[in-house]
């Protein structure tokens, strides 16, 4: 059985399920359909598994080893992945054990390796990064020993993706993935392209946005819905980083609409987190705070990991923007504890910079200096070029607020100007980057203090132009869209906050063996 299927292949299976008489053929078709719909339609997967499991169990009890009984492992695997996507990790683990207990290499030789792939997804859902990587490597070993070349490519691609999630500075070949025939072609290309985007996000946001977009399109064609939505969010985040709020809002909106169709609660709340962060930059601080408080509350009920850390940090940024420094510091402390536990260099560096700004605003310069020194060491060691703008801007702000020793090699009149000019210079090296009004304002004020009114005037004009652009963005489509969509989601449809779906509730009542990637 293939790991992924095209829509045409799924349509064929649908026809078999509709037309075939009861018996071995229709059971096998239903299990195959459940497997291939596990991300395209998780609720349908669980319904199909519920239908076939009594027949499968009865067959195993009477004629151990026949074709129907051999479907047990594959059906349990499909339920495991679907349950994980709904955030029901305990049920997912149970299904995984059920699948392993009924592996039958004679009838389904790929199932053992596929079990490791599903375990990796369950592990990612639980924030168990090391377990996820170990499972992916074990999957690759299984496929290599079995001579499953297509699946081996996919397992290797997922290993690369997981590595880039944790270590985006890891070596990544500049050669594009080679499209293979059949199952592996678009699937492993999509995963490798997404891994490349993760690596580029720290260095070249514009290129990262293009790579995420390409990966998302490939993922959609192969039914990798979780990867598809993650890539939409990744593209939006990269574009947001470049200051294009309108395009970022479109990406986030597309991700939210796609996530809502899945019914996966954690994915929907993740989309809200990106919305909440964008609302802060659009000036809708109260709405941003309320949205992010809801996200933190919802994610706190799930396995604690990097996603919750990101939500705490996003809320801290909004609170900082509204001059609630003490509350912001508390959120950052919670975020940093989780980031350090996860040991991800990119997230740690990025949020050390934010923590330094929060500490500076709450009159803790010594701790702020320590945070920036640690962030700078990570940025320089890992080559996180796109973070240099934030790093230098935070250093400039800290030196302006407090009397601190000047940096070595300073060529500007003050340390604040030294770092602010460096932030602008680093930004101009990034394709598609545009300076925010706040940076131009800062430079204008600092040069005016030094009596260089010509430079101050030039920066003031640039600040005015940037403000006009930002004001236009705040008044136009994105803010209205985000507000309308959030209100609509809170009014109707499935519950907006994380809660078991109706599909999940029904299958527990039915006693099904049931089952998110980051």
Region annotations inferred by a language model:
Residues 6, 23, 42-43, 89, ...:
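TPR-repeat structural position
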Residues 15-18, 50-61, 97-107, 137-147, ...:
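Amphipathic alpha-helical segments of tetratricopeptide repeats
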Residues 28-42, 71-88, 111-127, 151-167, ...:
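Tandem amphipathic alpha-helical repeat scaffolds
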Residues 433, 449-512, 516:
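Hydrophobic positions within repeat-based interaction scaffolds
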């Amino acid at each position: 059985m293939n790991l992924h299927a095209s829509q045409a292949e799924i349509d064929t299976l649908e026809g078999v399920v509709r037309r075939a008489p009861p018996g071995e053929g229709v059971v096998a078709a239903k299990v195959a359909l459940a497997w291939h719909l596990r991300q395209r339609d998780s609720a349908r997967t669980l319904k199909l598994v519920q239908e076939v499991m009594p027949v499968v169990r009865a067959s195993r009890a009477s004629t151990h080893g026949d074709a129907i009984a051999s479907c047990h492992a594959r059906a349990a695997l499909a339920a495991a992945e679907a349950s994980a996507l709904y955030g029901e990790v305990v049920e997912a683990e149970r299904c995984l054990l059920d699948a392993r207990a009924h592996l039958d290499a004679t009838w389904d030789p790929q199932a053992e390796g596929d079990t490791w792939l599903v375990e990796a997804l369950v592990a990612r859902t639980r924030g168990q990064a090391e377990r996820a990587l170990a499972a992916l490597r074990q999957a690759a070993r299984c496929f290599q020993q079995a001579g499953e070349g297509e699946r081996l490519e996919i397992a290797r691609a997922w290993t690369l993706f997981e590595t880039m999630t944790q270590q985006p500075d890891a070596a990544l070949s500049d050669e594009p993935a080679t499209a293979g025939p059949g199952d592996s072609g678009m699937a492993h290309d999509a995963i490798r392209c997404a891994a490349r985007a993760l690596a580029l996000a720290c260095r070249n946001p514009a290129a990262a946005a293009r790579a995420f977009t390409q990966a998302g399109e490939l993922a959609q064609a192969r039914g990798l819905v979780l990867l598809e939505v993650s890539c939409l969010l990744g593209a939006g985040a990269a574009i947001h980083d470049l200051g294009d709020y309108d395009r970022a809002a479109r990406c986030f909106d597309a991700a939210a609409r796609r996530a809502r169709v899945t019914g996966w609660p954690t994915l929907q709340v993740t989309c809200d987190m990106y919305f909440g962060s964008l609302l802060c930059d659009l000036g809708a601080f109260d709405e941003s705070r309320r949205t992010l408080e809801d996200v933190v509350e919802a994610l706190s009920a799930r396995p604690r990991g990097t996603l919750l850390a990101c939500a705490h940090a996003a809320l801290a940024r909004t609170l900082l923007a509204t001059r609630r420094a003490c509350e912001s510091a508390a959120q950052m402390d919670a975020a940093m504890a989780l980031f350090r536990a996860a040991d991800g260099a990119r997230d740690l560096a990025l949020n050390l910079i934010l923590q330094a700004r929060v500490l500076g605003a709450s009159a803790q310069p010594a701790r702020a200096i320590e945070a920036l020194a640690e962030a700078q060491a990570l940025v320089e060691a890992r080559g996180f070029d796109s973070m240099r703008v934030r790093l230098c801007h935070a250093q400039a702000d800290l030196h302006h607020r407090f009397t601190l020793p000047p940096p070595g090699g300073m060529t500007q009149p003050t340390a604040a100007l030294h770092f602010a000019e460096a932030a602008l210079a680093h930004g101009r090296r990034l394709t598609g980057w545009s300076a925010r009004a706040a940076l131009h304002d800062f430079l204008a004020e600092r040069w005016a203090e030094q009596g260089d009114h010509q430079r101050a005037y030039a920066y003031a004009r640039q600040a005015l132009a940037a403000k006009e652009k930002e004001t236009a963005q705040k008044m136009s489509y994105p803010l209205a869209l985000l507000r309308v969509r959030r209100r609509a989601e809170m009014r109707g449809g499935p519950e907006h906050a994380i809660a078991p779906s109706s599909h999940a509730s029904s299958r527990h009542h039915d006693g099904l063996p049931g089952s998110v990637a980051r």
